[in-house]
Swiss-Prot record:
<dbReference type="InterPro" id="IPR019926">
    <property type="entry name" value="Ribosomal_uL3_CS"/>
</dbReference>
<dbReference type="Pfam" id="PF00297">
    <property type="entry name" value="Ribosomal_L3"/>
</dbReference>
<dbReference type="InterPro" id="IPR000597">
    <property type="entry name" value="Ribosomal_uL3"/>
</dbReference>
<keyword id="KW-0699">rRNA-binding</keyword>
<dbReference type="GO" id="GO:0006412">
    <property type="term" value="P:translation"/>
</dbReference>
<feature type="region of interest" description="Disordered">
    <location>
        <begin position="125"/>
        <end position="151"/>
    </location>
</feature>
<dbReference type="GO" id="GO:0019843">
    <property type="term" value="F:rRNA binding"/>
</dbReference>
<dbReference type="InterPro" id="IPR019927">
    <property type="entry name" value="Ribosomal_uL3_bac/org-type"/>
</dbReference>
<dbReference type="GO" id="GO:0022625">
    <property type="term" value="C:cytosolic large ribosomal subunit"/>
</dbReference>
<comment type="function">
    <text>One of the primary rRNA binding proteins, it binds directly near the 3'-end of the 23S rRNA, where it nucleates assembly of the 50S subunit.</text>
</comment>
<dbReference type="InterPro" id="IPR009000">
    <property type="entry name" value="Transl_B-barrel_sf"/>
</dbReference>
<dbReference type="GO" id="GO:0003735">
    <property type="term" value="F:structural constituent of ribosome"/>
</dbReference>
<keyword id="KW-0689">Ribosomal protein</keyword>
<keyword id="KW-0687">Ribonucleoprotein</keyword>
<keyword id="KW-0694">RNA-binding</keyword>
<protein>
    <recommendedName>
        <fullName>Large ribosomal subunit protein uL3</fullName>
    </recommendedName>
</protein>
<comment type="similarity">
    <text>Belongs to the universal ribosomal protein uL3 family.</text>
</comment>
Length: 210
């Protein structure tokens, strides 16, 4: 069964392991989530729990939102996400999910929205090679061939310049270095997608390599 929690990316720092190794970590603030709904195979065709994170002013919510959260005896939430294949039987609607669902050393997947880079060329966006910069070359950072003459068109999927970033990205198999239950913090080894203060979803790894 998968387990998960919603949180906000705070930033990066570094901690020392017991053997003196310096470990770069990302700090994720995961205040208690509330189970808003349980979905089962019988009712919805799949198993999942719906989590709510961060309170939202009632003035900013509509009646369906208020009614949905009232069933869980809680206030309207700013972020609502589903954790698929979760332990539906072990959780009840209205129950809080805290950082202690994870333990130090566990392997997790972290999902977030990558930083937006704006309109970028093919070298930055797709990692293509540039042309010669001197010796009479007039080809430097352009996208290159658009394809053969015969179809007389550019095929769909051709890698060209365009807006970069702002996509949902999941980084898999990150290790939890520390769980701070007092301050509701998770310290995850390495970097996670997204800007500071952005929403991230931490879930148990689907492809554990240990």
């Amino acid at each position: 069964m998968t387990k998960g929690i919603l949180g906000r990316k705070i930033g990066m720092t570094q901690v020392f392991a017991e053997n003196g190794e310096l470990i770069p970590v990302t700090v994720i603030a995961a205040n208690p989530n509330v189970v808003l709904q349980k979905k089962t195979t019988e009712t919805d065709g799949y198993n999942a729990i719906q989590l709510g994170f961060e309170d939202k002013r009632e003035k900013l919510t509509n009646k369906p939102e208020q009614g949905h959260t009232a069933k869980a005896s809680t206030t309207p939430k700013r972020f609502i996400r589903e954790i698929r294949d979760a332990d539906v039987d072990g959780l009840e609607v209205g129950q809080e999910v805290k950082v202690d669902v994870f333990a130090t050393g566990e392997i997790v997947d972290v999902t977030g929205i990558s930083k937006g880079k704006g309109f970028q060329g093919v070298i930055k966006r797709h990692g293509q090679s540039r042309g010669p910069m001197s010796h009479g070359s007039r080809y430097h950072r352009r996208p290159g061939s658009m394809g053969p003459v015969a179809p007389n068109r550019v095929f769909k999927g051709k890698k060209l310049a365009g807006r970069m970033g702002g996509d949902q990205v999941t980084i898999q198999n990150l290790e939890i270095v520390q769980v701070d239950t007092e301050r509701n913090l998770l310290l995850v080894k390495g970097n996670v997608p997204g800007a500071k203060k952005s929403l991230v979803v931490v879930q148990g790894a689907v492809k554990v390599t240990q």
